[in-house]
Amino acid sequence: MGLFEKLKKGKKSSQPAKTQPQNHQQDLSQKMAPEIRPGGVFMVQLLMKERCEMPSNEQFLEALSKHLGNVEQFGERGVCVNFAAHDYIAELKDGGVPVMLMVSNCDEFATDQIDDFRRSQMWDCMDDRDHILSECRYQVLATDTLGGGLPAKKRANMLMDYLEALLELYPQCEAVYNINSGKMILADEIRKKEISGIDRFIRYAVNVRFFNIQGTKDHIVDTLGLSLLFIEDLQYHFHDMDPNWVVNHAYNMALYLLNNENPIKNGDTIDGIREGAIVQDIQWKCQYEDALIQPARAVLDICMNEYAAGNRS
């Protein structure tokens, strides 16, 4: 029996079943980008149409304390404002230190920083992508520092509580762009609060991507964003299965890894798919490998038995 037996079938992805091939030049030769460094800095941009003023310290503390507990502002306000989240202590070699939160001034948003490759993988708001990137000319950058010193589930919840507080502070925010994963999602989708707990991190911070392999019938589904929690991203290289089923499996699998503290080892098996449903009597083997699609990183490759593509040892 595989490690995936208790997960329920999750929400369908907004990614369409028929997707045009992504003809992008691959570059896996570069070193790991800082935004996907395991345990690295969480980075999101709040996108808006008009420039806005930074909230007052009192407004910040009211919203952040409601969501994050004991929060203290420190340092001078300038191009940014900084806070210490005292209920979230990062365990470092020299002892515990509160996680630091930073929120920048509202500044111009350089849309050209998002290349065609990343734009092609914004499945959660594909219908709104172009008008958001053309109309939202301003952004507020928000980050955490030292969050990698928290347990994975605690950091996942903290980051999403932080994000919900930011969207209360910035009601003019139209969309959230996650620099770590390349995911863009409408701010109102988060404001609805239809998802709770650590599920929010999987839905709002992890990007499940889809690629057709030009000249073949092969596809790749992978994730980006799990490395913030010291969890390897997922990769599926396959043919002859509905990609939406695989996207759904990837979201469920990502949630399983987070819920269970990343328990999978090389050679372990997980529940597979039959007619879109996750079933126990089909088992897929897992293996840690190098990513097939940029950025360069280690991934947990899922071998889909007769649907698997490519060469595996």
For the regions a protein language model found, what residue spans apply to each?
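N-terminal low-complexity, intrinsically disordered segments
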Residues: 52-131
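Structural alpha-beta junctions
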Residues: 65-76, 161-176, 256-264
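Short, hydrophobic/proline-enriched secondary-structure or compact coil segments at domain edges
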Residues: 40-50, 136-146, 302
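N-terminal alpha-helical "arm" segments
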Residues: 2-65
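Conserved aromatic-histidine-acidic binding/catalytic patches
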Residues: 45-48, 52, 147-155, 238-242
